[in-house]
A protein has these predicted regions:
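Serine/threonine-rich low-complexity intrinsically disordered regions
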Residues: 7, 147, 178, 208-213
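Residue-level detector of anion-binding/catalytic polar loops
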Residues: 21, 81, 194
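C-terminal cap of metal-dependent C-N hydrolases
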Residues: 118, 175, 184-215
Length: 215
């Protein structure tokens, strides 16, 4: 939701009543408005996230920092978690590295062309053309993601190491969902694991301790 829209207080109350995660995105709210809404959500005990940070938001300006800077500030304080489409298209690596923290996690924002060859696809009712792995609508705007999480893992691991890449692509997202038994290897956690080869391609998938065929 966009913090600057009408009835935002009522929306937060409904989210709190029904246990809905409040995710800020596709917004042009200013810095103070964004932080104010986050504070209200925190008072209500809500889990708050930033929807694909940077995308669908105005860029940071040093005199008008806007929602991106507000969400980064709140993430630093531990009040929100932020999603990053770390595919090198929606966000270049430098932007991902700048925003990376213990409260940031990778998402794909995947559409039908994710992991597929270049060509023509659809996003809802919109025609989409994928060229060079980048999906665009006729206007030229980016139309969802085509990367897989394993591809983002490989890129991130090259800069931050395997351990941090594992955490970035698993644990924080599970924590946002309140799933303490996911996103970690620990006694009592669900045995959901993905095995990758040296090229970071999935070669083995285990769900609840059982091997899943990849053929």
């Amino acid at each position: 939701f966009a913090p600057e829209t009408e009835n935002v207080d009522k929306l937060l109350e409904v989210c709190a009543e029904h246990g809905i995660i409040a995710s800020l995105g596709h917004t042009e709210a200013d810095y103070d408005t964004t932080l104010s809404v986050i504070a209200k959500a925190k008072e209500l005990g809500l889990t708050v996230t930033g929807t694909h940070l940077f995308n669908g938001m105005p860029s940071i300006h040093h005199r008008a920092p806007g929602p991106v800077a507000a969400l980064l500030t709140a993430a630093k304080a531990g009040d929100v978690s932020v999603e990053l489409i770390a595919d090198g298209v929606h966000l270049v690596d430098g932007a991902v590295d700048m925003a990376h923290s213990h409260r940031a996690f990778a998402i794909t924002d995947a559409m039908a062309a994710a992991g597929m060859a270049d060509g023509d696809y659809e996003l809802g009712s919109l025609p989409v053309t994928v060229s060079g792995g980048v999906a665009r609508v006729p206007s030229g705007a980016i139309a969802g993601g085509t990367s897989t999480l394993s591809q983002q893992f490989a890129s991130f691991a090259a800069r931050h190491g395997l351990g941090e890449a594992v955490r970035f692509t698993s644990t924080p997202a599970a924590d946002v969902l309140g799933e303490a038994n996911l996103g970690r290897i620990a006694v009592g956690a669900r045995a959901n694991l993905v095995g990758l080869n040296s090229h970071y391609q999935p070669v083995r998938v285990i769900v609840d301790g059982a091997d899943i065929s990849l053929s």
